[in-house]
């Protein structure tokens, strides 16, 4: 029988060893699987972060391109403005030339009129008493005089016609230049409207991408916090559940279950999802984009206590008795000191004191204070206030220095006299 019992004991020991070894192997493989899952999650986070960086790089390139286009459009605008200025200068030059030609034409017309008047005077005043010879001579002389005047008049008319043609051509050129200037102004206004639209589009795109980047950063921050908490929990579990095949008695499943129940769940609380509307409102107010969370280091550093209040807030019965006795001894003396100080204080104005702040004094006899006190009629509105009698002059503090009081008295005496200038 003893041999049978020893054999069964040895078999049971072997079975226990095999079971514990298998359990340790299973736990080891589970920890490896958890590590792999964490690595996969970190890889996915890195990929998402790289994608966000690529998107931001593409956005920055687009912004640079847009800025280059804006610069090109601005240069075009400047060139158009320069062309407009040149054309305006040319138009002004043409106008000056036209004005000069008009002045010349007016001068020529005046000369022609003067010549015509001279000819009429010469024709209207021939001498009647002269002989026919003299008349013929006069006619010959007039012919000789009028022939060059006629040629001069013809030359003047030709010059005037030429000047009129030049003026007409210049006016046509001015009209064409004015039309070109109007076209250029309309083109410049259209370009300016396009620039304004383009700037508005750029600003909207920039604001949208900024909001998206902030949302991605907040999500990445929350995921990093989750990963840190999960890593800490896995490290604790790995410390508690470490594979020890050599000594089976070191590992106790009951302790593991107890510690597993006490461990806080790091990933129980899901973070708040940040929407674009909340993001815009938070940025306009000046708040942070990510939700406020306590750091995992601070949570892990705090000790776990079942009590609701810390040990420093609890008071033992002996301490309570000592405090009660100390308060009973100190309160009456403090009250007497306060009353004494209130007696010595100068009374404040009723506007600065509320009914709750006015100190209550005992009623005094009027024999001592009749000569010093002044009785005033109280209004119905202020009748609810407590009665405050002014203290005597002996109890008042000396608030005015003697020199100042003397100067005030001298000034009051001086007011009665007038100085003659």
Swiss-Prot record:
Q: Which UniProt keywords apply?
A: Cell cycle, Cell division, Centromere, Chromosome, Meiosis, Mitosis, Nucleus
Where is composition skewed (Polar residues) in this entry? 133-149, 262-287
- What gene does this protein come from? mde4
**In which residue ranges is the amino acid composition biased (Basic and acidic residues)?**
224-238
Instruction: Provide an example Pfam family for this protein.
Output: LRS4
- Oligomer status and interactors: Component of a monopolin-like complex composed of pcs1 and mde4. The complex associates with the kinetochore.
Compartment list: Nucleus; Chromosome, Centromere
What is this protein's name? Monopolin complex subunit mde4
**What InterPro entries does UniProt report for this protein, alphabetically?**
Lrs4/Mde4 (IPR018479)
Species for this entry: Schizosaccharomyces pombe (strain 972 / ATCC 24843) (Fission yeast)
Superkingdom of this entry's organism? Eukaryota
Miscellaneous information on this protein: Transcription is induced by mei4 transcription factor.
- S-S pairs: none
């Amino acid at each position: 029988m003893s041999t049978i019992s020893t054999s069964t004991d040895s078999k049971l020991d072997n079975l226990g060893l095999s079971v514990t070894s298998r359990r340790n192997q299973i736990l080891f493989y589970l920890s490896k699987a958890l590590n792999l899952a964490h690595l996969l999650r970190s890889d996915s986070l890195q990929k998402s972060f790289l994608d966000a960086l690529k998107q931001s790089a593409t956005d920055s390139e687009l912004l640079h391109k847009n800025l280059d286009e804006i610069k090109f459009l601005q240069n075009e605008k400047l060139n158009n403005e320069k062309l407009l200025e040149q054309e305006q200068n040319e138009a002004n030059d043409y106008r000056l030339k036209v004005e000069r030609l008009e002045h010349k034409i007016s001068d020529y017309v005046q000369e022609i009129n003067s010549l015509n008047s001279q000819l009429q005077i010469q024709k209207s005043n021939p001498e009647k008493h002269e002989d026919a010879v003299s008349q013929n001579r006069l006619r010959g002389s007039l012919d000789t005089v009028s022939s060059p005047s006629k040629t001069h008049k013809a030359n003047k008319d030709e010059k005037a016609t030429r000047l009129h043609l030049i003026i007409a051509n210049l006016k046509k050129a001015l009209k064409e230049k004015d039309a070109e200037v109007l076209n250029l102004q309309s083109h410049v206004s259209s370009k300016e409207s396009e620039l304004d639209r383009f700037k508005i589009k750029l600003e909207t795109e920039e604001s949208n991408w900024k909001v998206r980047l902030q949302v991605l950063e907040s999500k990445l921050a929350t995921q990093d916090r989750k990963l840190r908490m999960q890593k800490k929990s896995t490290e604790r579990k790995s410390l508690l559940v470490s594979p020890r095949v050599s000594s089976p008695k070191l590992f106790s499943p009951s302790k593991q279950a107890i510690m597993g129940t006490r461990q806080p769940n790091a990933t129980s609380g899901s973070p708040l999802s940040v929407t674009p509307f909340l993001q815009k409102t938070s940025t306009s107010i000046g708040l942070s984009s990510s939700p406020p969370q306590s750091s995992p280091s601070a949570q892990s550093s705090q000790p776990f206590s079942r009590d609701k209040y810390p040990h420093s807030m609890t008071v033992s019965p002996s301490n309570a008795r000592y405090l009660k006795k100390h308060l009973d001894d100190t309160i009456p003396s403090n009250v007497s000191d306060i009353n004494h100080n209130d007696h010595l204080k100068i009374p404040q104005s009723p506007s600065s004191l509320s009914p709750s702040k006015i100190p209550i004094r005992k009623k005094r006899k009027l024999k001592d204070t009749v000569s010093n006190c002044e009785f005033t009629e109280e209004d119905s509105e202020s009748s609810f206030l407590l009665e405050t009698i002014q203290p005597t002059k002996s109890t008042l503090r000396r608030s005015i220095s003697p020199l100042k009081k003397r100067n005030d008295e001298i000034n009051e005496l001086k007011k009665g006299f007038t100085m003659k200038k």
